Amino acid sequence: MYMARCGPKNNVLCFPFQLSFLFSKRLINKRFKYTLQTEDEKNMMGSLSKNKIITPEDVEFKLAQLREFSNTLKERIHNTKSVNSDGHQSNSIAPISEDSRNVNVTKTSSVPNEEKSKNLSDLIHSSFLEKMDHLVPKVIRERVADDDILAKNLFDRSHSNWAPVIDRLYVSEKRFMDIDSREFSVWLNGTVKYLPFHSILHLDEMLLEQINGDVVKFNTHMYECIFNNLGNLKPTNFNQDGTNDKVILKMKELLERYDKALKITEERINKKEGFPSKVPKMTQAILNNCLKYSTKCSSFHDMDYFITKFRDDYGITPNKQNLTTVIQFYSRKEMTKQAWNTFDTMKFLSTKHFPDICTYNTMLRICEKERNFPKALDLFQEIQDHNIKPTTNTYIMMARVLASSSSNAVVSEGKSDSLRLLGWKYLHELEDKNLYRHKKDDLNLFLAMMALAAFDGDIELSRALYYLFIAKKYKTLCANWKGNILVDQDTIWKSTLMPEMLNYLMLAYARFDPRNLPVLSGYEKGIELRRKFLREFDSSMRLDDTDKLVKFKLPFLPISDLNSEAQVLAESNAIWSFNMENGGTRNTLTSSNEAALEDIKKYRQLLDSFAQEAEDFNEFKFKVMYEVTKMQRESINVNVFNKISLHTYLSIPINLKQQKEFLRRLTFFTFQQHEFEAVIKRLYEGYRNIPSSHTRDQNSISTEAISVSKPETTEDLNLIMHDIWYITCLRHKIMMDTTLYELVMKAAIEFQNEDLAKKVWNDRGKFRTTVPFLKMDQRIRIAKDQKFAHLMVEFFTKQGKYSDAIAIILSSKNRFNWTYSMVRNLHKALEEIEDRNSVEILLDVVNKKSHAKALKWEEQELNM
C-alpha cells in the first residue's frame, strides 16, 4: 500500500487546473489498480504459507484511503494559484490530446537532477532557519556561529540544553554587547532554563557587561531568569543543610545588587539627575524560587531570611504557591505543628491565599504521618464543600491515611476493620471516576493497596500485588533496556526492587493470622477486585514464556495460600534474602566456607595496611568504616536494606512467637556500636605491636604462613580471626539504634525472656555513651529514654515483679512525665492483689506534675 504526503510544497512545477485534475484522476485510477494488483500478488504468495485473503473490509479501507487522498489533492489544487486563470473560470474540461500529454510529461521529466537536489537543499535550509528563528534571536545565532551546537542542543524542546550555548557565547568576542536589553531579556526569561551553576555565573556576568555594570538597568526579566535557574538547581550531598551554600550566597548577592540599585535610584532622584525609565522590581516568582531552593537544602534559617526580607524590604508577602512550598518544607522536616498553623493561615488570609488541591494533598500526607484519620476526613469534606476538584493522589492519600491509622487499636478507636474498608471504598471511587493519572500515581496506587492489604494481614493479596508490580517494572525495564539484559541483571534488579513494597510485604507476613478474614471478602466489589489480582498472580512458575531471554522469578512458595507459621517464616526469609542479594545476582548471605576463609585472608592483609599507614586510631577507624561502607554497596542492595524494613522483618518472628528465629535474625543483621569500637581498638593495638620484619608476604597468604610468622598463641590467633570476620560481616549488618533496642525489649516481653531483657538493658546503657546517641537532640533523647523505661515497666509487670516496676517509675519521676496510660497495666495488677500502698504511691506520681513543671510553678508564685 502506498502512502501519499499532501500539503503545500515549494519549488514544484505548477500545472493548469484542467491538466492537473486529469493527471490526478488518472494517477488515482492507475494507483488504485496497481495497489489492488500488488496486494493480490502478495496475498497469493502469502496464501501458500499463511492462507490469507483480502477481506471486503480491507478493500473498503483502501477505498476510503484513496477517496481521502483524492479529496485532499482536489482541495490543494483548488487553493493553489493557477498559472492559467481562464482555466479556473471554465465549467467544462476540454479533452486533452495524447500529444499534449506527452509534451507536458517530457517537460516535467527534463528537469536536471542537480536542480532537484538544489531545491531540496534550499527547502531543508529554509526550514532550519525558520525553526531557528523561533528558538534564538538572529543576533544570538550569529554570535554563537555554530549551527550544529544550536541544532544539537535546542531542536528537541523536551530535552533542550542551553549550557553549551551560553558557554559558547561566553567565549565569543561580543557576547551580549550592543543588543537591546529589554527585548532580549524578555526572550531570555521565558526560554533559557535549567542551567548548571557555572553557566548561570557566565550568564550573569554577560548580562552585567551588556548594561556596562549599571545595576539600575538590570531589569526584572534578568532577575527572574537568574533566580529561576538558581531555584532549579539541586544541593550537593555534602551540603544539605544550606550552610555556606554557593547557590544561597549567589541569591543573597543578587538581592544585595537589587538593594544597591534602589539606593542608586533614590540618590539620582534626590540629585535631580532624572528618574530612570523603568525601575526593576522583585516578584512573587523570585521569592518562590528562593523558597524552593531553601526547602531543598532543608534550611529553615535561609527560608525565614527570604520570607522576612521580601516582606519587610519589598512589601511582598508569600502567596498561595509560596505558602504551599513552606508547608511542604515543614512536612519533610517533621514540623507538623508549624505546617498546620501555616495551613490555617492560608484559609483565613484571603480567597487568593485559600489552599488548592496541592496544599490539601500535602496536609493529607501529614495526616498519614500523624495517623490522624479524623482530621483527614475533615479535610476531604472541606475539599468537597469548597468545590475543589480532587486528584488521583487525593484518593490515594485518603486510603493511605486510613491504612496507617488502622495499624493501632488505640489510634483507630477500635475500628481498624472499618477504617480499612473505608480506605478500599476511596480506591473504588477513584476507579469509577477514571481520573487522569501521572506516572508516579501507579506506584502510589499500588503502595496504597499494599498498605491496606498488609495492615489487614491479607498475605495472599499482598503477595499478588507485590508480584504484579515488580513483574511489570522488571519487564518494562528489560523491554526498554539498551544494553545486554543478561549482563546487566545487577543494574536492572537494583532499579526494580523497592524498599516500600518490601516493607509492606514483610508487614503482611508479620500480621499473619489464619483465623482472620480479609475485609475485601465482605462485599461484592471487594471480592471481585481481590479475585482479579489473585487470578493474575502465578505462584508456581513465574516465568515469562513469551521471551526466553527475560526470565522473571520471585522466591514465593509454590502454593496460593500460606496456612502455617513455618511457611510464613520460610517465605519471608527467601524474599528478604532475594532483595538483599539484589535479585539473586549476588551471594553475600549464602557464601561458602572457602569463600569466607578467602575473605578473612583478604581483609586481614587490608586491615594490616590500614594500621601501618594510619597516624592514629581515629584515622584507622575512619579507613575501616569507609571500607565497610564500600563492601556493603558492592555486596548488598542498599536501596532496600534500611532500618525501617529491617525493623519490620525482625517483628515477624516476634508476632509469630518464634524466639529462636528472632535471635538468629537479630544476630545476623545487626551489630552494636560499643562492640564495634572494642573490635576496632583490639585490631589496631594488635597490628601496631607487630614488627615490620614480621609483615607477611603480600602475594601469598596461607593459614600456615600466618601461624608461623606471628608469635601469638592459638587463642590470640583465633581472636584475631574472629575480629576480622566480625568486620567482614558488617557488610550485611545495621547498627542498633534506640528503635531496635525497643524492639528487642518488646521481644523480651513477648517471650518472657529475663536474660534477654537484662542484656538489652545493659547494651542500651552502653549505647547511651556512644557518639550516635549523644549527637541526638536532648528532647529526643529524653523521649527515647522514657519509652524504653515504659517498656521495662511493662516487662516487670508481666513477670509479676511489681516492686521493680515501681522502682523504675520512682527513680525517673523527676525526669519523665509518667501518664496513666503508661502505667495502666501495672495499676490494674496492683488493684488485683489489693496492694493499696503501692497503688497510692503510683497514683501520686501520675497525678503530680513533673519536677520541672513544679519548679516553674513555684517560680511564678514567688514572682507574684
Curated annotation (Swiss-Prot):
Organelle targeting peptide span: 1-76
Keywords: Mitochondrion, mRNA processing, mRNA splicing, Repeat, Transit peptide
GO cellular component, one term: mitochondrion
Main location: mitochondrion
Biased composition (Polar residues): 80-94, 102-112
PPR repeats: 319-353, 356-390
Residue ranges, annotated region (Disordered): 80-117
Subunit structure: Binds to mitochondrial small subunit 15S rRNA.
Similarity-based family: Belongs to the CCM1 family.
PANTHER family linked to this entry: PENTATRICOPEPTIDE REPEAT-CONTAINING PROTEIN GUN1, CHLOROPLASTIC (PTHR47936:SF1), PPR_LONG DOMAIN-CONTAINING PROTEIN (PTHR47936)
Note: Present with 876 molecules/cell in log phase SD medium.
Protein name: Mitochondrial 15S rRNA processing factor CCM1
Organism: Saccharomyces cerevisiae (strain ATCC 204508 / S288c) (Baker's yeast)
Gene name, Swiss-Prot/TrEMBL: CCM1
